[in-house]
Structure formats: C-alpha cells, structure tokens
Swiss-Prot record:
Keywords tagged on the record: Cell projection, Developmental protein, Differentiation, DNA-binding, Neurogenesis, Nucleus, Transcription, Transcription regulation
Subcellular location per the Swiss-Prot or TrEMBL entry: Nucleus; Perikaryon; Cell projection, Axon
Residues covered by the bHLH domain: 28-80
Protein name in UniProt: Transcription factor atoh7
CDD domains on file: bHLH_TS_ATOH7
Function summary: Transcription factor that binds to DNA at the consensus sequence 5'-CAG[GC]TG-3'. Involved in the differentiation of retinal ganglion cells, photoreceptor population and optic nerve development. Required for retinal circadian rhythm photoentrainment.
Keyword DNA-binding assigned: yes
Lineage: Eukaryota, Metazoa, Chordata, Craniata, Vertebrata
Biased composition annotated in UniProt, kind: Basic and acidic residues: 15-27
Length: 134
C-alpha cells in the first residue's frame, strides 16, 4: 500500500470552498471506508465472543481479552488433540487389556505362546472383559 499524501480536503484550506465536489467526494469515500472498517471490527468482535463461549475459562469472572481468548483456544485445542491421539492408541481396548494380562503372566513366570493369530484371537474371545465407552 503506498503512502497517502495529504490532500487539500484534509488541510481545511480555502481550496475546499472553491471545489466542494472534491470535498464531498473525499468525505463520501472516507465515510464508506469508516463503515467498512466498523463492519469488519464488529465481525471480528462477534467471532471472539463466539470463541469465548466455547473455550473453557476455568473460573474466570472477567471477560477474557482477545489475546487471552486466543491463548485459551490454543491450549484447549492442544488438550483435545492429546486426548484424541491418546484414544487412537487404544483402538482395541480388549487386546490392550489382554496384553496387560499377558505381561502380568510373563512377570510371574507363566509364558503363553501362540503359533497363529487365530489361537490368540480365540484366547481373546474367551476373556469376559468388555470395554464400556464413556
């Protein structure tokens, strides 16, 4: 964006009274630009208000600033991402539970070895543990 040079309309000089059409044109452009900026800021403030409603505030009584809102949103998104990635590691909770049981058996000196995945799956189905989702 190139720098704006002050015009005669800005200076309030005698030329304003000599060329009212230029002055009115500049005023209309300035009013239109101000209206666009006001509308942009209202949209931005509305977006921040909506973000504040979905981001946990953890006991804050005062309204969060824009900066604080962005920081809280970032922390919240990262926490949700961690939860999802941790949940992704435990796709099959029955097998995870079974692996924990086998680990316990191995530490006690009982080692079970299966030659095929079918035998392992049969063993898995014989356990009565059922995962209950939240």
């Amino acid at each position: 964006m190139k720098p704006r040079r002050p015009s005669c309309a800005d200076s309030g000089s005698d030329s304003d009274s000599r060329d009212p059409e230029k002055f009115e044109s500049a005023m209309r452009r300035r009013m239109a630009a101000n209206a666009r900026e006001r509308k942009r800021m209202q949209g931005l403030n509305t977006a921040f208000d909506r973000l504040r409603k979905v981001v946990p505030q953890w006991g804050q009584d005062k309204k969060l600033s824009k900066y604080e809102t962005l920081q809280m949103a970032l922390s919240y998104i990262m926490a949700l991402n961690r939860i999802l990635s941790d949940a992704g590691r435990h796709v099959d909770p029955q097998k995870d539970w079974l692996n924990l049981q086998f680990d316990g058996l191995q530490t006690e000196g009982y080692f079970m070895h299966y030659d095929s995945p079918v035998e392992s799956d049969c063993m898995l189905s014989s356990f009565s543990y059922h995962y209950e989702s939240l």
